[in-house]
């Protein structure tokens, strides 16, 4: 069941820039377009405080 829907702006950035943005925010994830691959990706905080990266295959 979807309880809430949000719209996000997707910005072009490197994976490192996305990691820095995540570090400086309270968000659990950042959705961005990877400048190298030109793919929409998601970097997120893992339960062990490391970061994970989701790169969907199209």
What do the PLM-derived regions correspond to, one by one?
Residues 1-58:
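N-terminal, polar/charged subdomain of small-to-medium soluble alpha/beta proteins
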């Amino acid at each position: 069941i979807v309880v809430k829907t949000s719209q996000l702006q997707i910005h072009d950035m490197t994976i490192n820039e996305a990691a820095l943005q995540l570090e400086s925010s309270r968000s659990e994830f950042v959705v961005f377009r990877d400048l190298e691959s030109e793919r929409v990706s998601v970097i997120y905080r893992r339960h062990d405080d490391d970061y994970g990266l989701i790169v969907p295959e199209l």
